[in-house]
Amino acid sequence: METKIKINNIQLFGYHGTGEKEKSTGQLFEIDIEVSPVNDTPISDNLAQTVDYTLLYDEVTTIFSKRRYNLIEYLANKIADTITNKYRVNSCKVVIRKPNAPIKGDFDSVEVEVISNV
């Protein structure tokens, strides 16, 4: 059995990107996190047996807000590396979307996905 803990569509406003408008005006970002805890199946009904998703959420918002990033790829890597090094997980997948990326044309979003395995 494999357990996955997911937080979908964390919405945060930030000033990440390479363009001047992105850096001055900012935009909405959407972030998904998926982790596989070391203990796939907890042996008791105890939070200490797994990964507390409220801590994962706090980790994401802290890293996102701590500084401005040019590349969302680098930001996604930073989040994934921090989570895999700080929490008892076998893997961490981070997806970051820019719904309003500065591209002329019709599209839903620009997205990067990073997977970090321990």
Regions found by a protein language model. Name each.
Residues 1-118:
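N-terminal, polar/charged subdomain of small-to-medium soluble alpha/beta proteins
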